[in-house]
């Protein structure tokens, strides 16, 4: 049971988180499980480039594990996002490719070249009821994701790249001390789990006021085995995520095996 719980959240999902760089699934999925977006759809094409550095936790930002690069391009209503995790030798350790249409998630694909695994997510209309949306998740060995099984799209479903817009949509509630729940996609378990965001502190860092927001599993059983993700966010608009501690996409080699990685991810906003 412990091993099952320790592995249920995969690299590209909790931290997925991710490199949680923070720009997300259609910002928020409506409670009726349709693929709804903000009144004004979030612009996933901005910024065109975002970078980050992933450090070993506890190294005082000295031990670099990976660098992160997110690029976005727009063609009419379609936005293509590519998120690369680059090893210290310059090789690409993992890549995530995401497609949005009019601010709504269409597809997500992850390839982890070191561990030789891949996964994919699709949001599509239910053939039997096109007014409702389906979530199709696949994951397996090899660099080509296998076919996935469809299920109803849960309300407020979030992936790595959609966490930031979801957080923005609920910013006022978070600042009032309310916990905001959502469903986070776990590729390797091919399902979603319920998580919540909650503000835990406010302090001054590098001459600016920041908020500390914790992402944690709602289930006590799951939370016992999964460390929370700790986000440090600008208090002032646009509330950029400056850094986070927790699970990220590329793995780290321990002995002969590639293990899931918790790291400190620091974003470089220009």
What annotation goes with each model-predicted range?
Residues 15, 135-136, 214:
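Compositionally biased, intrinsically disordered low-complexity segments enriched
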Residues 1-9:
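N-terminal secretory signal peptides that target proteins for export/translocation
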Residues 31-103, 108-126, 181-270:
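Acidic, serine/threonine-rich low-complexity disordered tracts
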Residues 11-26:
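Bacterial N-terminal signal peptides
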């Amino acid at each position: 049971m412990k091993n099952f719980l320790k592995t249920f959240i995969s690299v590209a999902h909790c931290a997925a988180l991710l490199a949680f760089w923070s720009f997300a699934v259609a910002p928020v999925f409506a409670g009726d499980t349709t693929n709804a977006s903000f009144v004004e759809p979030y612009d996933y094409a901005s910024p065109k480039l975002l970078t980050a550095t992933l450090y070993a936790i506890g190294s005082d930002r000295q031990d670099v594990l990976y660098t992160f690069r997110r690029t976005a391009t727009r063609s009419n209503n379609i936005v293509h996002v590519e998120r690369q995790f680059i090893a210290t030798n310059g090789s690409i350790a993992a890549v995530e490719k995401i497609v949005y249409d009019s601010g709504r998630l269409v597809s997500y694909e992850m390839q982890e070249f070191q561990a030789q695994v891949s996964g994919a997510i699709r949001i599509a209309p239910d053939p039997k009821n096109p007014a409702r949306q389906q979530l199709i998740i696949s994951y397996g060995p090899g660099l080509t994701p296998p076919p996935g099984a469809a299920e109803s799209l849960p309300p407020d479903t979030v992936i790595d790249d959609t966490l930031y817009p979801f957080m923005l949509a609920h910013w006022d509630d978070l600042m009032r001390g309310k916990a905001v729940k959502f469903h986070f996609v776990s590729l390797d378990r091919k399902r979603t789990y319920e998580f919540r965001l909650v503000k835990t502190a406010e302090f001054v860092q590098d001459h600016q006021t920041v908020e500390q927001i914790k992402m944690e599993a709602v289930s006590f059983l799951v939370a016992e085995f999964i460390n929370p993700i700790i986000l440090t966010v600008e208090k002032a608009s646009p509330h950029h995520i400056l850094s986070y501690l927790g699970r990220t996409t590329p793995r780290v080699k321990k002995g002969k095996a590639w293990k899931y990685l918790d790291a400190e991810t620091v974003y470089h906003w220009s």
